[in-house]
Swiss-Prot record:
Protein name (Swiss-Prot/TrEMBL): Protein translocase subunit SecA
Entries under Gene3D superfamilies matching the protein: Helical scaffold and wing domains of SecA (1.10.3060.10), P-loop containing nucleotide triphosphate hydrolases (3.40.50.300), SecA, preprotein cross-linking domain (3.90.1440.10)
Family: Belongs to the SecA family.
GO biological process assignments: intracellular protein transmembrane transport; protein import; protein targeting; protein transport by the Sec complex
CC cofactor note: May bind 1 zinc ion per subunit.
Reaction catalysed by this enzyme: ATP + H2O + cellular proteinSide 1 = ADP + phosphate + cellular proteinSide 2
InterPro entries listed in its UniProt record: Helicase_ATP-bd, Helicase_C-like, P-loop_NTPase, SEC_C_motif, SecA, SecA_CS, SecA_DEAD, SecA_motor_DEAD
One GO cellular component, as annotated: cytosol
Entry keywords, A to Z: ATP-binding, Cell inner membrane, Cell membrane, Cytoplasm, Membrane, Metal-binding, Nucleotide-binding, Protein transport, Translocase, Translocation, Transport, Zinc
CDD domains membership: DEXDc_SecA, SF2_C_secA
Origin species: Paraburkholderia phymatum (strain DSM 17167 / CIP 108236 / LMG 21445 / STM815)
GO molecular function, one term: protein-exporting ATPase activity
Length: 936
């Protein structure tokens, strides 16, 4: 109550910020008459002047009014577009490292030019981040005219681009590209073997377009560069036959044995997107697998040797029960292509992790691609937080303002619209069944069509858009379908969606990037006339004028009919996606309207709010075809959406907390890599490693401060001879000296190791040997890091079970991840020292050849893929991929062999068979099937 009272007096934080920025707007406007007097050359020369002032120490903040005024004047001359005052405010918000929420049609692309121009003056580069290649190319080509006029260079960073072109793009003052490509380039730069092979400069300033889509929707999906692992194709094919033979159980068994409506072999948790085998399901699966010869007769699926099989069983089950064709994926050209659930776009080249993608391929009977091993990965949260300054813009950020502030430290500022909005948002209508809902949608569309009003219908899946298309065909209503399958026609369809009587069906409109102008997009058609060489120059101007006159007539006609009408056929999990769909109508003060039509069969209502709404309908005795239209129901749905959003926020926050552990380690590894690449001579580093490793070896057999009776000299001599090519008569030294101590023995061994090393260097020369050492070091570091990533994945899969032992899973993960990391660094030192000490040199040329070969192997990995992998897809109930388990076991085993403190490697033979109903060996007191058996 007090807060509301104070806000009335002082205004909200948002209002105060906007008011503050309006003072700067007045200063920019005051400069306009003076800037208008400048010639083109004088205006261009301002950039050189600004650059000199920045290099002399003047701050960008002080330069802002002049730079914005110059940029606005250049835009007027080149693009024939003048920044509105609210756009200047948007530009300031971006410059100060905040998020600008601007409604659709308010000119976000033009707003970005202001802070981009200002920050590019520093010469440290600016990245403009978009959601897809089409928008990156469109915006770069469109705005390059403005930047080039002002003497700025512009680069476009696209996927599949040549390495040289990428370096040019990053060297430019301003670089446009997609979030994925910027992230992958960062990872690739940390896998190179030469400094000049890197493409990125220091991460200085980024403006992220559709910031909510990139920093929130995609934040659960780390960027992963992966290579091919072990082939299990045959096993996926065999397992694909299992799910159809199992029945779903309805209801969860409670402690008293009640709760099961229909017994079955597996249960589904649709909220968590998980599937679990029941007791009878395990028995049936074991029986079938034994019949197929995949496990021994009477053998348990929980036996250690069957963990891989368990992984495949769950992958097949999830593929059949939780992932549907034309909703979660499409089959195109013999491949399973993921559909982005937020935007409805096809995610070509992206694959689900943990064997799920292969299981879906087996289900759809297409060629099964091999499983992958992670080579490098990073989340968007950790990538974008590396920029010295980060900002973003979107039409819908206010609902996620807390998350932006909590995770990225970004404040959200809502920018006032240039003209007051006139869109009317009508109450939701809720029907009992999906068919009743679609009939109501068709009636609404027909009403709009009859009065010449354009309609945009939003659906949440490709399947629903195609079903609606069939119903419209039956009703005889002409329409356009815009979904992931028509990606190439996307912009053209959206541009014309504002014409009279136009009906457009679209999957989620997030990131579509093209404005819907009432009456159609005359500018695009005018551009086609300008570019058409077959039309004589003197005819072009009259044709374009005629086009604009026709457009004005259509524009007025559509405005009179009520503007663009938005129909939502389902509520999305996120209110923001619904708001994005609504935001397509009512741009720049145009009229418009929106309404959502829902049914109790929609996933959101069914899972989160269905019982409450159904009870209201039953109480009101609603006849078939009748809808509920009440504020209480709409609020109930919004409450369900808030619950889902809160849950998704927790998932993203938890992902970040876990990823922060590997991120700290990633920084250490990448920093070491960069130091190695830039160092001319790493002799000191190698020497320190050699001394450390040799000291550890000697101390194993001759401990510090010990007496002669405790020494194992024969074993030490053998270890030095076999592993390190050092033939030392230590026993003779002891016999000859009456008072030799452990430190003297250590010094003698270190001196011998140094001498052996120097003799190798003398054979080929310091420069050649140093190049070889660098190659060995990089190759070993990269291989160990890849194995370490797999080990962390494996550790993460089952860490939540520590909660059963009253331990904090996050703390346990941090502790064990650190132990694994320390063991990895020890194994790197050991491996590098071993190779350097054991290398047999015939000639300098041979050494150079070996170094080149190692670099070649490291930089040209087979079948490398660049993808997202959603951690929620892998699921805690599914076993870690075999490759992760094997790599983890191998690494822990290495650490033990070299004196590390990690646990002994897992061995199937050493573990006794545990029955499903036996107490879990971890000591939690639970049955094995309810504890560690769950992740098997």
């Amino acid at each position: 109550m007090t807060t509301g009272f104070l806000q009335k007096i002082f205004g909200s934080r948002n209002q105060r910020l906007v008011k503050q920025y309006q003072k700067t707007v007045a200063a920019i406007n005051a400069l306009e008459p003076q800037i208008e007097q400048l010639t083109d050359d004088q205006l261009r020369a301002k950039t050189t002047e600004f650059r000199q002032r920045v290099s002399s120490g003047e701050s960008l903040d002080k330069l802002l009014p002049e730079a914005f005024a110059v940029c606005r004047e250049a835009s007027k001359r080149v693009l024939k577009m003048r920044h509105f005052d609210v756009q200047l405010i948007g530009g300031m918000v971006l410059h100060y490292g905040k998020i600008a929420e601007m409604r659709t049609g308010e000119g976000k692309t033009l707003v970005a030019t202001l802070p981009v121009y200002l920050n590019a003056l520093s010469g440290r580069g600016v990245h403009v981040v978009t959601v897809n290649d089409y928008l990156a190319q469109r915006d770069a080509e469109w705005m390059a005219r403005l930047y080039n006029f002002l003497g700025m260079s512009v680069g476009i960073n696209l996927s599949q681009m040549d390495h040289g072109l990428k370096q040019e793009a990053y060297a430019a003052d301003i670089t446009y590209g997609t979030n994925n490509e910027f992230g992958f380039d960062y990872l690739r730069d940390n896998m190179v073997y030469e400094t000049d092979a890197r493409v990125q400069r220091t991460l200085n300033f980024a403006v992220v377009d559709e910031v909510d889509s990139i920093l929130i929707d995609e934040a659960r999906t780390p960027l992963i560069i992966s290579g091919q692992a072990e082939d299990h194709t045959e096993l996926y094919v065999r397992m694909n036959a299992l799910p159809p033979l199992l029945d779903r159980q309805i209801g969860e068994e409670k402690a008293d044995g009640t709760g099961v409506e229909k017994p079955g072999d597996y249960t589904l948790d649709e909220k968590a997107r998980q599937v679990f085998l029941t007791e009878s399901g395990h028995e049936k699966a074991e029986r079938l697998l034994a019949e197929w010869g995949l496990i021994g007769e009477g053998e348990s699926l929980y036996a250690p040797q069957n963990i891989t099989l368990m992984h495949h069983v769950y992958a097949a089950l999830r593929a059949h029960t939780l992932f549907y064709k034309d909703q979660h994926y499409v089959v195109q050209n013999g491949e399973v292509v993921i559909v982005d659930e937020f935007t409805g776009r096809l995610m070509a080249g992206r694959r689900w992790s943990d064997g799920l993608h292969q299981a879906v391929e087996a289900k759809e009977h297409v060629k099964i691609q091999s499983e992958n091993q992670t080579l490098a990965s990073i989340t968007f949260q950790n990538y974008f937080r590396m920029y010295a300054k980060l900002s973003g813009m979107t039409g819908t950020a206010d609902t996620e303002a807390y998350e932006f502030n909590e995770i990225y430290g970004l404040e959200t500022v809502v920018i006032p619209t240039n003209r007051p909005p006139k869109r009317i948002d009508k109450q939701d209508q809720i029907y009992k069944t999906a068919m009743e809902r679609y009939n109501a949608v068709i009636r609404d569309i027909r009403d709009c069509y009859d009065r010449g009003q354009p309609v945009l219908v939003g659906t949440t899946s490709i399947e629903n858009s195609e079903l609606l298309s069939q119903l419209l065909n039956k009703a005889g209503l002409p329409h356009e379908v815009l979904n992931a399958k028509q990606h190439a026609r996307e912009a053209a369809i959206v541009a014309e969606a504002g014409r009279p009587k136009r009906i457009t069906i679209a999957t989620n409109m997030a990131g579509r990037g093209t404005d819907i102008v009432l009456g159609g997009n005359a500018e695009k058609q005018a551009a086609f006339i300008e570019a058409d060489l077959s039309i004589p120059e003197e005819e072009k101007a009259p044709r374009i004028q005629k086009l604009h006159d026709e457009w004005q007539t259509l524009h007025d006609q559509v405005k009179a009919a009520g503007g663009l009408h938005i129909i939502g056929t389902e509520r999305h999990e996120s209110r923001r996606i619904d708001n994005q769909l609504r935001g397509r109508a009512g741009r720049q003060g145009d009229p418009g309207s929106s309404r959502f039509y829902l049914s109790l069969e929609d996933p959101l209502l069914r899972i989160f709010a269905g019982d409450r709404v159904r009870a209201i309908m039953d109480r009101l005795k609603m006849p078939e075809g009748e809808a509920i239209e009440a504020g209480i129901v709409t609020r109930s749905i919004e409450s369900a959406q808030r619950k889902v959003e809160a849950r998704n926020f927790d998932i993203r926050k938890q992902l970040l907390e876990y990823d922060d552990v590997s991120n700290d380690q990633r920084k250490v590894i990448y920093q070491q890599r960069n130091e190695l690449l830039e160092a001319h001579d790493i002799t000191e580093t190698i020497g320190a490693m050699r001394h450390g490793v040799i000291t550890d070896i000697v101390r194993q057999f001759v401990p510090a401060g010990s007496i002669e009776e405790q020494w194992d000299v024969p074993e030490l001599e053998e270890a030095l001879r076999n592993d390190w090519q050092l033939d030392l008569a230590i026993q003779e030294m002891i016999n000859e000296s009456q008072s030799i101590d452990p430190d003297e023995i250590l010094e003698a061994v270190l001196a011998a190791a140094d001498e052996a090393y120097e003799s190798k260097v003398e054979q080929v020369g310091r420069e050649s040997f140093s190049a070889f050492e660098r190659s060995v070091m990089l190759q070993t570091l990269d291989r160990s890091w890849r194995e370490h990533l797999a080990a962390l994945d494996h550790l993460r899969q089952g860490i939540h079970l520590r909660g059963y032992a009253q331990k904090n899973p996050k703390q346990e993960y941090k502790r064990e991840a650190f132990e694994l990391f320390a063991a990895m660094l020890d194994s790197v030192k050991l491996e590098v020292t071993r190779i350097v000490m054991n290398v047999q040199i015939q000639s300098p040329e041979q050494l150079e050849q070996a170094a080149e070969q190692m670099e070649e192997q490291g930089s040209h990995l087979e079948n490398v893929e660049f993808r997202h992998a959603d951690y929620s897809e892998g699921g805690a109930a599914v076993a870690a991929a075999p490759v992760a388990a094997n790599a983890a076991a191998a690494m822990i085993g290495d650490a033990m062999a070299h004196g590390g403190s990690a646990a002994a490697p897992f061995s199937g033979d050493a573990v006794p068979k545990v029955g499903r109903n036996d107490p879990c060996p971890c000591g939690s007191g639970k049955k094995y099937k309810q504890c560690h058996g769950k992740i098997a």
